Amino acid sequence: MTQQLTAVVPAAGIGSRMAADRPKQYLHIAGKTILEHTIDRLFSHPAITRVIIAISQTDPYFASLPLANDPRITVVDGGAERADSVFAGLAAIDDENTWVLVHDAARPCVRLNDLERLVEAAIRSDSGAILAAPVRDTMKRGCQQINGLQGIVSTVDRNNLWHALTPQMFKVKQLKDSLQHALKEGAVITDEASALEYCGYIPQLVKGRSDNLKVTQPEDLALAGFYLEQLMKE
């Protein structure tokens, strides 16, 4: 593949569930911040030549990172919601007919072979593609009971259920238009693919590794550190 690709990384969130003294993307594991590892993994794909990072306007951490001086990095002001930050990143891309990958700032363990398969699948598709992992556990649908505890309503058939991962890859204009339309109509948009789904597109599912975890809870840090150490040995 000779086409150059851009990635957008929304990194304006505060990560309150981590209960840390700083946003989770700036926590250190395996010698670097999570954000630095995430960007390193994206640049492991030779076609990804630019990464746009959307950060909070009051972010006091990014400027001290080596990333701040990397010519391949573009920084834009993020917004209150993920979609706002993604929009800001998309606005910095001049060619709306090109492809863009959107990747979570706190997902530092994505592997090169997953990136390669995602890019190949997206370019073959009219509706883009996402990395995803099949659901393996038994899934329960719950409801809140009078005592405040959660009760089981039913067991959900896990056939054809997938965990949506990132990166997610789409044409820039297609993603922009889908996000705008879905949000204007009040649709619940939890990831980029959900905006395209709302607009009638069928993005492709590309089976990815389950160790491409998103650091969300404190216990995720040790696991992400272990996975990164394995990556560094390869």
Swiss-Prot record:
SUPFAM superfamilies: Nucleotide-diphospho-sugar transferases. It catalyses: 2-C-methyl-D-erythritol 4-phosphate + CTP + H(+) = 4-CDP-2-C-methyl-D-erythritol + diphosphate. PROSITE patterns: ISPD. Signal peptide: none annotated. GO terms for biological process: isopentenyl diphosphate biosynthetic process, methylerythritol 4-phosphate pathway. The keyword Iron-sulfur does not apply. It comes from the Bacteria. Pfam families: IspD. Pathway: Isoprenoid biosynthesis; isopentenyl diphosphate biosynthesis via DXP pathway; isopentenyl diphosphate from 1-deoxy-D-xylulose 5-phosphate: step 2/6. The keyword Transferase applies. Keywords: Isoprene biosynthesis, Nucleotidyltransferase, Transferase. InterPro entries: IspD, IspD/TarI, IspD/TarI_cytidylyltransf_bact, ISPD_synthase_CS, Nucleotide-diphossugar_trans. Coiled coil: none annotated. The record marks R158, K214 as: Positions MEP for the nucleophilic attack. The record marks R17, K24 as: Transition state stabilizer. GO terms for molecular function: 2-C-methyl-D-erythritol 4-phosphate cytidylyltransferase activity. Its EC number is 2.7.7.60. Catalyzes the formation of 4-diphosphocytidyl-2-C-methyl-D-erythritol from CTP and 2-C-methyl-D-erythritol 4-phosphate (MEP). Belongs to the IspD/TarI cytidylyltransferase family. IspD subfamily. HAMAP family: IspD. This is 2-C-methyl-D-erythritol 4-phosphate cytidylyltransferase. The gene is ispD.
